[in-house]
Amino acid sequence: MNTLRYPVLMILSFMLLCGCGSPHGKPGKEAEILAPDQIMDFAILYGENCAGCHGAEGRGGAAIALADPVYLAVADDASIRNATANGVRGTAMPAFAQSAGGMLTDKQIDLITSQIRSRWGRPGFLNSANPPSYSAKSAGNPAQGALAYNTYCESCHGPGGHGGAKGSSIADPAFLALVSDQGLRTIIITGRPELGAPDWRANIPGKPISDQEITDVVAWLASQRAQSAPHANSTSNTTQHQESTNAR
């Protein structure tokens, strides 16, 4: 009997010692749930707030791809952060900052901004390409924009922007009502590679569309918005630099 008693006592003692550090009913660390404003994990923040429009990996969504080195080479952190925090007026891009009625703290927005660039950007990607500026630097001329459209865009999007064999209509008032001037400019610069649309360099091989021509095309498109649309007063294109793209 004694030979069995001692091993049993040792086992019971060991079990008691193991239980001392975890009182019955006390949840372990794995059961702790962070408050929404305490989450500082990019995958969670991006997945819950951005992936629905921009795609699970920063591409493939309805909005412009964020995991696009061309976009990240022309858009600076301040522009990306501003669009994330304050949204884009008149578009589907909401404000996420608590100060603007959203749910995210400044630190969370800073994290999203920095991680988008560190994960998907390529330092120096367009250093030798002399890309157009992210924002317009001058007023656009709709008449000149129509001519530039005919040169660079009509082959895909058709006469007047009403759709062609390769591209959809971009003069549709329903579309123009949902995208800002800056959004149009960004799409022209970066293209939509996932949809087969080239960036500003490749519409005509060896003849990239110029910064001013982009500004003019945006002015021409903006002039076709319905007057009741939120951007109806932006046809001069002078406020592009104050707006963020529909997808940042």
Task: Give the residues covered by each predicted segment.
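Gly/Gly-Pro-rich "capping" loops immediately C-terminal to redox-active cysteine motifs
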Residues: 32-39, 43, 55, 59-85, ...
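Residue-level signal for the nucleotide or nucleotide-sugar donor/cofactor binding architecture
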Residues: 37, 75, 104-107, 140, ...
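Axial heme c-ligation environment in periplasmic c-type cytochrome domains
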Residues: 61-68, 86-119, 124-135, 164-169, ...
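Bacterial N-terminal signal peptides that target proteins for export
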Residues: 1-10
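Surface-exposed interaction/gating patches
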Residues: 136-161, 166, 172
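The canonical Cys-X-X-Cys-His
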Residues: 42, 46-56, 112, 116, ...
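C-terminal motif of bacterial Sec signal peptides marking the signal peptidase cleavage site
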Residues: 16-19
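Electrostatic cytochrome c docking/interface patches
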Residues: 21-44, 121-148, 233, 240-248
